[in-house]
């Protein structure tokens, strides 16, 4: 129902122990709520939020906590109003590293989550066929991951995540290892597919331009221990076109986001696309 939060983090902190036994605080007192939005006709629609910050500021840690792959030291994480205690089908995750099973074909990789969750064979077949078409892998259903480019492997990862139709999609720098043109193509693909789903996306990057182009809101984090220093709304409408990156309003927002990062304590690196 309207007003419900899709994802909530309340006072979340997480520390680790270094190889030398020293405590390392990855994130400290993370707080945000992503509202479950509805269209005027009552349809559930998802938001696109981005976590932006220098390398090592805890962005990936936040995603892993929401995914249920790790647990916070303090604080509470809710997805669809339910406390996160472990992984679940309501959340899907796409990683930067290629994670396809090398012994399975493209179709078998996409089908994997459906199969282990005991979906009927015909439903699995239909979903896989549709997703292969949606992500632009027509003709590659029987190919193995080692024969695919990096961009194509990430298309497989996105399709595999979408197969279970999660309400929340977590993406950990999925395009970081791709060349500039392929990264742009994948951004376009992601926005198109996201626009056809009701999923909320939480996307990690350290590329300022990528964050602005994709997001409805940008959570800017400082260097470790990562803390959200500003929630930056992105005022541009949708659908979006890559040409907007050359406009004055885009450049003005880029400079504002960069100024937020410069004001933050600590050291780290962020990237501005060229």
Name each region found by the language model:
Residues 169-172:
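Catalytic Walker B motif of ABC-type/P-loop ATPase nucleotide-binding domains
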Residues 158:
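Hydrophobic anchor residue at the start of the ABC signature
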Residues 111, 115-140, 192:
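Conserved ABC ATPase "signature" region
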Residues 104-112:
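Short coil-to-helix segment of the ABC ATPase nucleotide-binding domain corresponding to the Q-loop/switch region
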Residues 143-146, 164:
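Conserved signature/switch motifs of ABC ATPase nucleotide-binding domains
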Residues 87, 107, 133, 141-144:
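Signature (C-motif/LSGGQ) region and adjacent switch/coupling loops
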Residues 75-86:
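Conserved ABC transporter NBD signature motif
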Residues 67:
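Helix-to-loop junction immediately C-terminal to a conserved catalytic motif
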